[in-house]
Curated annotation (Swiss-Prot):
This is Small ribosomal subunit protein uS4c. The keyword Plastid applies. Signal peptide: none annotated. It is found in: Plastid, Chloroplast.
Length: 202
């Protein structure tokens, strides 16, 4: 399944706030979706499916990528759900978003694809690149790159940067301090439901 490119508002109306997908918040009309489904029994499958979709749309990953992350998480030590979230959060496009260098993860992905971003002084144009502790993220030394990202930081670096990341406005440099813990996840989600959804596939 390819990456979703349709209207983002439609997604957040169905799944709730997804800050990685869009900085808009859902505005439900009275008597709309939630009310119409409140009297219906929602199946366990649908609950798991919607939680999986939250993860996929928030991080902007394909079905194949998500299934691959689940398989990696199952082989790793520790909680499968927590490792799954760590794999998603440590993607380069998400790290750029959490640093406030882009308004959304699709915006961060565009910066990476257009070669505006360096990791450890090397251009990386793969949004799914998995960042590691002590990786540092900088801006390509070109006026266009610096202007775009400086504007993003000015307008979008409003919320507190999570503890596993640091950003130096003086050096225009982001640093991955460590692998993040569960409390630093940028999405309200029940990851165990996602793992259960893939229980027969991974």
């Amino acid at each position: 399944m390819s990456r979703y490119r349709g209207p983002r508002v439609r997604i957040i109306r169905r799944l709730g706030t997804l800050p990685g997908l869009t900085n808009k918040t859902p505005q439900l009309k009275s008597g709309s979706i939630n009310q119409s489904t409140s009297n219906k029994k929602i199946s366990q499958y649908r609950i798991r499916l919607e939680e999986k979709q939250k993860l996929r749309f928030h991080y902007g990953i394909t079905e194949r990528q998500l299934l691959n992350y689940v398989r990696i998480a199952r082989r790793a030590k520790g909680s499968t759900g927590e490792v799954l979230l760590q794999l998603s959060e440590m993607r380069l496009d998400n790290v750029i978003f959490r640093l406030g260098m882009a308004p959304t993860i699709p915006g961060a992905r565009q910066l990476v694809n257009h070669r505006h971003i360096l990791v450890n002084d090397y251009i990386v144009d793969i949004p799914s690149y998995r960042c590691k502790p002590q990786d540092f993220i900088t801006i390509k030394n070109q006026q266009k790159s610096e202007t775009i990202i400086s504007k993003n930081i000015e307008f979008y670096q409003k919320s507190k940067i999570p503890n596993h990341l640091t950003y130096s406005s003086l050096e225009k440099k982001g640093l991955v301090n460590q692998i993040l813990d569960r409390e630093s996840i940028g999405l309200k989600i029940n990851e165990l439901l996602v793992v259960e959804y893939y229980s027969r596939q991974a």
